[in-house]
Amino acid sequence: MKEIKINKKALNISITNYLLRGIFFLALIVTNKAKADNCSKIGQIGDSGVCNGMLIVDREDLKNAIADDSYTIQKDGVNYTFGDDSNNVYTGNIKNFTNLFKGKTNFNEDIGYWDISKATSLRQMFDGATLFNQDISNWRPSKVKNMAFMFRNATSFNNNSQSLNDWGEHTSKVEFMQSMFFGATSFNQDIGNWRPTNVKRMNSMF
């Protein structure tokens, strides 16, 4: 019987290479998942479908869709809307949400999934939006400095009967809250956990 000799060095190299390839592909999968969970790192404004099927939008995209009451942005033949429960626009790159729904008396759609983590201004965002009453307690306004007039005269707003306490310490950078809920006659939620330690103006807040 012929003796079979095994090149142990070559075998070890092959096994090592195989294991390294496996580790590489596993790392690639983990990295891609992490990126998919953080849309701001996976694409640019206008990219579609790269993050959980959402369209990455900027302020102008939102303004145009709101202005014509379609609440829809078209990209590559696909309609991305926040006028229903599709949840398919990503807002995490937007810093300025000022006046977006000001005076929009017909808007009451679920935008609680919006990412406002980079926002610095929510000033007058729902000012006079008399129909709006959606739950936005999952928002994290940790960089927001201006919430003045945010819900002024938003007469239906009560956060869909959900607490806004989760904003808690995320309000610590807010400087302006004047007239924030002025004329928001339905609002009656607990905000006792808020920590606006840097606030400068709170006059006529309610």
Residue ranges and their predicted role:
Residues 1-16:
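N-terminal secretory signal peptides that target proteins for export/translocation
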Residues 16-25:
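Sec-dependent signal peptide recognition
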